[in-house]
UniProtKB/Swiss-Prot annotation:
Swiss-Prot/TrEMBL keywords: Cytoplasm, Developmental protein, DNA-binding, Nucleus, Repeat
Organism domain of life: Eukaryota
Lineage, broadest ranks: Eukaryota, Metazoa, Chordata, Craniata, Vertebrata
A cellular-component GO term for this protein: nucleus
Known function: Essential for proliferation of the inner cell mass and trophectodermal cells in peri-implantation development.
Protein name: Upstream-binding factor 1-like protein 1
GO molecular function: RNA polymerase I core promoter sequence-specific DNA binding; RNA polymerase I general transcription initiation factor activity
Main location: cytoplasm
Cited PROSITE patterns: HMG_BOX_2
UniProt keyword Cytoplasm, yes or no: yes
Biased composition annotated in UniProt, kind: Basic and acidic residues: 365-377
């Protein structure tokens, strides 16, 4: 239930005070789960200033919705305090003096300009349906008009980057604080451990096997999108209106557009993906029947090793031929990883870069769960890093 602004407006300072009061007044036997402990909390003692005990309780319930659902009350209160302090540092950086405003993409410019006109034309239409109409109108724009939006975006983007560089020079203290608060120590330690583990695993492999991460067999059917979001992502990625964006900006924009389209359109993409999956299974079964027993065993071995960052043992097969590592898809991946999503081992050259996959997917959580369930039954091998090799059968 939303509180009135006069009673329910909480500043970050007020939230920190609430968490401190909770920490000081929590039950002494705080050994149970946080939900059990908070039910025995005396919220009258937590009350402060103009915030009653009931208001404090409701605010804590709102805060705890964004926290993990296990642990003691003390642990969750400490976690919430860290989040608020981190938010304060980030806001100081973003709201600092003269911080430049990020420019709108070409599509968002058209969307912002056209929204008032179309909302008057269709006063009773829902926002989702109106967004769908505007998306269609943008796709139907003449190339000359579309280029105007793209050029305006590029011009403002260049100005933004210049202003941002000046801002960082003039306010190095704010930049340094924002960098320190962007990644928690826990995350840093987790990434470092995973990085060291990957180094040890790769170094333990024979040199000939180290960087053959994906094996693709000649004639093997291409794996289709696993769900509706993947199909939408695939269709949007190569569209003309996305070509002027960088890899990172393109991923963000596709994620935003997915959130805007109506459920009926999402269901349509889902149906397309399911149909492609059925066709893929039929093609895969037919292709597997054409393999010799030796090649079939090699294929099963390679798919079994998928996802474990392991190469096929016994050195390179003379039947294997190396695919071009500088393909357009490989370049796109390298560009995406190059923006802070990979780590390179000290003392190795660029051909022996060991990537630690720590990026956040733009894909909704429910789709990622479905992907993990389908991954067990999938016989296709995804490229995580390194080179691709192809088998002639």
């Amino acid at each position: 239930m939303a509180l009135p602004r006069s009673q329910g407006h909480w500043s970050n300072k007020d939230i920190l005070r609430l968490l401190e009061c909770m920490e000081n007044n929590r039950p002494s036997d705080d050994n149970s789960t946080f939900s059990s402990t908070q039910s025995h909390m005396d919220w009258g003692k937590v009350a402060f200033k103009n915030f009653s005990g009931e208001m404090c309780r409701l605010k804590w319930l709102e805060i705890s919705c964004n926290l993990r659902k296990f642990g003691t009350l003390k642990e969750l209160v400490l976690e919430a305090k860290k989040c608020v302090k981190k938010m304060n540092k980030s806001q100081k950086y973003r709201n600092g003096p003269d911080f430049p405003k990020r420019p709108l993409t070409a599509y968002n410019r058209f969307f912002k300009e056209s929204w008032p006109q179309y909302s008057q034309m269709y006063p009773g239409m829902r926002s989702q349906e109106l967004t769908k109409i505007l998306s269609k109108k943008y796709r139907e724009l003449p190339e000359q008009m579309k280029q105007k939006y793209i050029q305006d975006f590029r011009k403002e983007k260049q100005e933004f980057e210049e202003k941002l560089a000046r801002f960082r020079e003039e306010h190095p203290d704010l930049v340094q604080k924002a960098k320190k608060s962007s990644v928690s120590k826990r995350t840093q330690n987790k990434v470092q451990k995973k990085f060291q583990k990957n180094i040890e695993e790769v170094r333990s492999l024979p040199k000939t096997d180290r960087f053959f991460k994906k094996v693709k067999f000649h004639g093997e059917p291409q794996k289709p999108p696993m769900n509706g979001y993947h199909k939408f992502h695939q269709d949007s990625w190569s569209s003309k209106e996305m070509q002027h964006l960088s890899v990172r900006e393109r991923m963000v924009e596709i994620g935003r557009r997915w959130q805007r389209i109506p459920q009926s359109q999402k269901d349509h993409f889902k149906s397309q993906a399911e149909e492609l999956q059925k066709q893929y299974k039929v093609k895969l079964d037919l292709w597997l029947k054409t393999l010799s027993p030796e090649n079939y065993a090699a294929y099963k071995e390679s798919t079994y090793a998928k996802g474990k960052n392991m190469a096929m043992t016994g050195g390179p097969d003379p039947r294997l031929k190396q695919a071009d590592p500088q393909s357009s898809s490989a370049k796109g991946l390298q560009e995406g990883f190059g923006e802070g999503q990979g780590l390179q081992a000290a003392g190795t050259d660029s051909s022996q870069t060991i990537w630690v996959n720590c990026h956040v997917s733009m894909e909704p959580e429910e789709n990622r769960k479905k992907d993990r369930e389908k991954e067990e039954s999938s016989n296709s091998s995804d490229c995580s890093s390194g080179e691709e090799i192809e088998v002639d059968v």
